[in-house]
Amino acid sequence: MTLMKTANQSEATVSGHKIEMHKSGSGPPLLFLHGGGGFGTFDPTASPLAEKFTVYAPSHPGFFGSERPDWLYTINDLAHFYKDMVQELGLEDYVLVGHSVGGWIAAEMAAMDHHNIKGLVLIDAAGVRPEKGEITEVFMVSGDTRLKLGFHDPSQVPSYDVISADPTPEGAAIGHGNMEMLSRLCWRPYLHNPSLPHYLGSVKTPALVVWGKQDAIIPVECGEMYSKLLPNATLKSIDNCGHSPQMEKPDEFNAAMA
């Protein structure tokens, strides 16, 4: 798998740690938190989101070129890190969007303090454990298998040939580091927080839950759970789509976000 960067990359310092920051657009602030595989073929800073919002899209600490704080071990730690970042950047009444693991971080942030969050969008988010289905074990399979699991029909994904190409040695090292950090954050318990469902009932922020119906990594059952646990949530499920609707069904995703 080849890793893709966005077109608007710079650097920011949060609590003394340097992170990659991708920023573009104009309008009210929107914070986009990527999944474990990064942004893939979807660059939020060059998407229709940047036509309505000033989009902030950081690379998570320990991912890509962002520094890895020694104290950061859990998704809850990462949520606190981003709460600090929001404060340091002075973001007011921002829209919070998260995909996969980024959606889990977003849900944790909203559960901590939702008063400064104008809107919440969870895209095929980790964080809750399905009652009937299973979350696929992504740490025990190859990168090629993970990539195939991520899409229902790869032919629908713009530039799929780019992300499916063999990585350079540098890209392979970055990908390995990303997975190492992901396992550090999400291994136990695996890709969920058993306490999170109990916190979500206090989140009054309007929420949109977007899910690919054929998600082979985190089943749509989890999207249904989020839409029930969040008091003001709407579920938008997208047919013939896997784990990353913003990549596999960009038109339908953008319509849902409009």
What role is predicted for each listed range?
Residues 14, 56-97, 255-258:
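Active-site loop/oxyanion-hole signature of alpha/beta-hydrolase fold enzymes
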Residues 131-132, 136-137, 144-205:
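Conserved alpha/beta-hydrolase catalytic His-Asp/Glu region
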Residues 13-67:
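Conserved HGGG/HGGXW glycine-rich cap/lid loop of the alpha/beta-hydrolase fold
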Residues 227-244:
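Catalytic histidine neighborhood in serine/cysteine hydrolases
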Residues 216-222:
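Conserved alpha/beta-hydrolase "acid-adjacent" motif
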Residues 203, 209-211, 215:
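Short beta-strand/loop motif that positions the catalytic acidic residue
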Residues 241-254:
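Catalytic histidine-centered segment of alpha/beta-hydrolase-like enzymes
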Residues 104-112, 117-150:
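Flexible "cap/lid" loop of the alpha/beta hydrolase fold
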